[in-house]
Amino acid sequence: MAWARDEGGAAVLEILVQPRASRTRAVGEHDGRLKIQLAAPPVDGAANAALVEFLAVALGVRRADVALLRGEAGRRKTVRVAGITAAAAVAALAP
């Protein structure tokens, strides 16, 4: 998938977030990125923390293995997940 690639022993994911959704879930590909709805509001980093928590649980990795590379203040984010391949991430997150 276009939104996941392997880079240096980790998966790099291109994500589009929708904060303040009714629940947190991955909803599919949108504009070349994985769209994830987050129940958390985009206030004081709550949406970023919710994204990290969601990805860690969904991918079966520690929260410390999920790093936000770009997009801390925007809806388009680039996330690096250590200890997993892009193929495994796609299998776990594809709706």
Swiss-Prot record:
TM helices/strands, residue ranges: none
SUPFAM superfamilies to which the protein is assigned, alphabetical: YggU-like (SSF69786)
Name of the protein described by the UniProt record: UPF0235 protein Adeh_1087
UniProt superkingdom: Bacteria
Listed InterPro entries: DUF167 (IPR003746), YggU-like_sf (IPR036591)
GO CC term (a single one): cytoplasm
Family note: Belongs to the UPF0235 family.
